[in-house]
Amino acid sequence: MSAQTITTTETTQNAQKPQQYHWRMVWRNIILYIIMHLTGFYGLYLAMFYAQWKTVFYSWFLLVIALQGVTAGSHRLWAHKAYKARLPLRMLLCIFQTLSLQNHIYDWATYHRVHHKFVDTNADPHNSRRGFFFSHMGWLFIEPHKDVEDKYKSIDFSDLHADSVVMIQKKYYHTFFAPVIGFYLPAAIPWYFWGENFWTAFFVATMLRYCACTNITFLVNSWAHIYGSRPYDKNIYPTESATIAVLTGGEGWHNYHHTFPWDYKTGEFGKYRSNLTTGFLDFMAAIGWAYDLKTVSEEMIMKRVLRTGDGTRKFDKIDKILNVDDDHHHEDMLWGWGDSDMAKEEMNYVKIHNRKED
């Protein structure tokens, strides 16, 4: 074999090798998260020993509504279209979501749709197969995998572009929403109204809240993709975790959620003690601010459990379920209501509560 032949063969083999993924660090995010955690822990120290009880309670309240901004707002409403909201509710959720300081709604919702559509692949921004830390927050410390950006372009975001609340927040997020609503006002209110030291208020009501809200939310991406049962689809990584459900206000029923992402409850049972967000949305529906709340019929749930579940979910009456096969493949993933790959049969089994005309 000639040297030219060897060179040609080596060139062909190298061309066939998949392009290696190299980390490119995002130092801005790394520095930001170091500062966030250091100041958050300092805020915890102040909350325990120096802050007024009113400041501590107020900070806890801000944490609760910030989580609602994420769960009811950027997640169930804008990412998954699991229900529809009148303008007053969309404005309220926009303010709540800003308090989470998890970037603007548009960024949150668009990348979350990519996460669902391509869950736990290289196209998933926080692919849990790359480890607990990566899926928790490490994904923010490096540039996204090329597949993330490529697949991002295949998802429809036209509904977000048509939402004036989303686009106004996106336009003014870094100049008004984050600095004023997210950072300054939460600290200024305790200082102005009950004489709390401003810096104590800042570290407790702003930085501790920011740190806690971020880590609680991120546990859904990490913990709830690794630990727990898979009663609805054993072929995917997301799991059921009651602990995460309580911490996040209902986002821990993650195997169910990835199986039926358009359900406004993000869980089969929707008990308020482990799904605070469902209670919030039911109240909003009662006063007319939320409508067209989508959920899944019991028959559809049973069929899916028997077909792809891990056997941990039991039913009292399964004899009415007919022609159920055991599939051992990864079901086509959906990002939520409106995904073009959603089967007509699935749409027929969806229940819509509080249906109203736009």
UniProtKB/Swiss-Prot annotation:
Enzyme class: oxidoreductase
Name the record gives this protein: Acyl-CoA Delta-12 desaturase
Originating gene: D12Des
Entries under CDD domains matching the protein: Delta9-FADS-like (cd03505)
Required cofactor(s): Fe(2+)
Note on domains (UniProt): The histidine box domains may contain the active site and/or be involved in metal ion binding.
Topology class, membrane: Multi-pass membrane protein
UniProt-annotated binding residues for Fe cation 2: 115, 225, 254, 258
Family: Belongs to the fatty acid desaturase type 1 family.
Location (main, coarse): membrane
Membrane-spanning intervals of the chain: 30-50, 55-75, 175-195, 200-220
Residue ranges annotated as motif Histidine box-3: 254-258
Residue window of motif Histidine box-1: 75-80
Natural source organism: Tribolium castaneum
Enzyme Commission designation: 1.14.19.6
Classification of source organism: Eukaryota, Metazoa, Ecdysozoa, Arthropoda, Hexapoda
Gene Ontology cellular-component terms listed: endoplasmic reticulum membrane
Keywords from the UniProt entry: Fatty acid biosynthesis, Fatty acid metabolism, Iron, Lipid biosynthesis, Lipid metabolism, Membrane, Metal-binding, Oxidoreductase, Transmembrane, Transmembrane helix
Any one GO biological process: unsaturated fatty acid biosynthetic process
Highest taxon listed in the record's lineage: Eukaryota
Annotated localization: Membrane
Reactions catalysed according to its record: (9Z)-octadecenoyl-CoA + 2 Fe(II)-[cytochrome b5] + O2 + 2 H(+) = (9Z,12Z)-octadecadienoyl-CoA + 2 Fe(III)-[cytochrome b5] + 2 H2O; (9Z)-hexadecenoyl-CoA + 2 Fe(II)-[cytochrome b5] + O2 + 2 H(+) = (9Z,12Z)-hexadecadienoyl-CoA + 2 Fe(III)-[cytochrome b5] + 2 H2O
Annotated Fe cation 1 binding sites: 75, 80, 112, 116, 257
Cofactor: binding comment: Expected to bind 2 Fe(2+) ions per subunit.
